[in-house]
């Protein structure tokens, strides 16, 4: 999985490519845990994400909980197959998806 970070002012955009699974989710979790304290909005751009496992969902849920305390989070560029997973798991009711 590739993780690209772009920070503009208080907005951190994390673009993901590849698979977010048991092997790769710790890298995303580390990036989120180590983000600057002044970040008030987190944008997860998952246009290039091909697959997400329960471990990946856990990291996204953890990020949402963290951002609820300090700002906001949204998920953008969600493909149909991952949107279906978000719908089945109820994540559509938890996340802001654009």
Predicted regions located by residue number:
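Short acidic-hydrophobic, aromatic-tinged amphipathic segments that line or gate anion-handling sites
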Residues: 96-98
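STAS-typified acidic loop motif
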Residues: 3-28
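Amphipathic alpha-helical interaction surfaces in cytosolic regulatory modules
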Residues: 22-94
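Short leucine-rich amphipathic alpha-helices used at interfaces
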Residues: 2-3, 34
């Amino acid at each position: 999985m590739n993780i690209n970070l772009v920070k503009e002012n208080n907005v951190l955009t994390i673009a993901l490519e590849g698979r977010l699974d048991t092997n790769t989710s710790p890298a995303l979790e580390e990036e989120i845990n180590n983000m600057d304290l002044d970040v008030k909005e987190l944008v997860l751009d998952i246009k290039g994400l091909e697959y997400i496992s329960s471990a990946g969902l856990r990291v996204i849920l953890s990020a949402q909980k963290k951002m609820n305390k300090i700002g906001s989070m949204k998920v953008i560029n969600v493909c149909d197959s991952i949107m279906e997973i978000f719908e089945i798991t109820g994540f559509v009711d938890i996340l802001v998806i654009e």
